[in-house]
Amino acid sequence: MIILRAVTVTAIAALIAATMAEPPLIAAQSESASVPSTEQTETGRVRLPNGIEVTYRIRLLPIASFPSLPAAIAAQLNEKKCMVPQTYQARTPENVIHGALERKGSDDWAVLCSVNGATTLYVFLQSQIAAPIALRHQRDTEWLGSEVLGAYGSAWGISLRLPAQIPAAKSGAFPDRSNLDHDAIEDADIERSSATHYFQNGTWIILESPN
């Protein structure tokens, strides 16, 4: 079943601000005066929703691992001391995507940025590169998964959805699918659930569905 939500940029910002006001996280990733230039690993122990306590290991890549990022965006991410978390399935650098997210033909980017044990999904629209939009913010350990029993890593992945790949909403959010003329962001908890973020008339339409 696909669930539809429409969220304004203001509402998202308020939600993330509230989340960031929580007590500081105890995480292996520590603050540094300099921007990390090499791959880092965040490790620790956490209790899963089923009550089992496991060890996790999350690979974090520096922004320099993504040379195709425009300099203006890379500079902002480095200023925030961002590292890009990689899923436990990753074989090549991931979780940085490029497409027409604002409108047809626009040149936009989305990036997962991990800082001090928490990750934010930032979107850089061409019309406001200097003011990235934060679509989701959560602890790095919120979504974990593994290919091998006991070897847990991040299960948060983002990818580009072309207009034809955007799922239908039973609520009729997109009665005329010919109006879907630009890309969307697939924001997934791998093998569990996913959300599709589509920007329309200044609002992010969010379609959520289990995998």
Residue ranges of predicted features:
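Acidic, small-residue rich beta-repeat scaffolds with periodic aromatic anchors
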Residues: 5, 11-16, 20-64, 139-211
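N-terminal post-signal-peptidase region of extra-cytosolic proteins
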Residues: 92-99, 109-111
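Acidic, divalent-cation-chelating loop motifs in proteins
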Residues: 96-104, 126
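Primarily extracytoplasmic ectodomains and periplasmic/lumenal surface modules that are beta-strand-rich
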Residues: 104-107, 116-120, 129-130
